[in-house]
């Protein structure tokens, strides 16, 4: 454990940020998974689920949780499957 006061603060903020990032990334993955299953099953609410997944993917890319190219690839796969 760190002894310096600023290092102790950084450990706390890093742990908070890590928890937030993990939660946001998990929510994004779940939304993408739900959208893909809705599209494959031709569900009634597939358009809503795809738009929610795209929104969460964009937010994850904006906060550098995933690379922007990966975000574009995921969105492209969702849109192609939803045609």
From Swiss-Prot:
Keyword check for Protein transport: no
Keyword Transmembrane helix: no
GO molecular function: small ribosomal subunit rRNA binding; structural constituent of ribosome
GO biological process, one term: translation
Pfam families: Ribosomal_S20p (PF01649)
Top-level taxon of origin: Bacteria
GO cellular component: cytosol; small ribosomal subunit
Keywords: Ribonucleoprotein, Ribosomal protein, RNA-binding, rRNA-binding
InterPro entries linked to this entry: Ribosomal_bS20 (IPR002583), Ribosomal_bS20_sf (IPR036510)
NCBIfam families listed in its UniProt record: S20 (TIGR00029)
Family label: Belongs to the bacterial ribosomal protein bS20 family.
Function: Binds directly to 16S ribosomal RNA.
HAMAP family named among the record's database cross-references: Ribosomal_bS20 (MF_00500)
Protein name: Small ribosomal subunit protein bS20
Species the sequence originates in: Staphylococcus aureus (strain NCTC 8325 / PS 47)
């Amino acid at each position: 454990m760190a002894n310096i006061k600023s290092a102790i603060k950084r450990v706390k903020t890093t742990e908070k940020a890590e928890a937030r990032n993990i939660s946001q990334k998990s929510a994004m993955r779940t939304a993408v998974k739900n959208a893909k299953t809705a599209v494959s099953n031709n569900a009634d609410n597939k358009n809503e689920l795809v738009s929610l997944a795209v929104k969460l993917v964009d937010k994850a890319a904006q906060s550098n949780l995933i690379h922007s190219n990966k975000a574009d690839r995921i969105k492209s796969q969702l849109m192609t499957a939803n045609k």
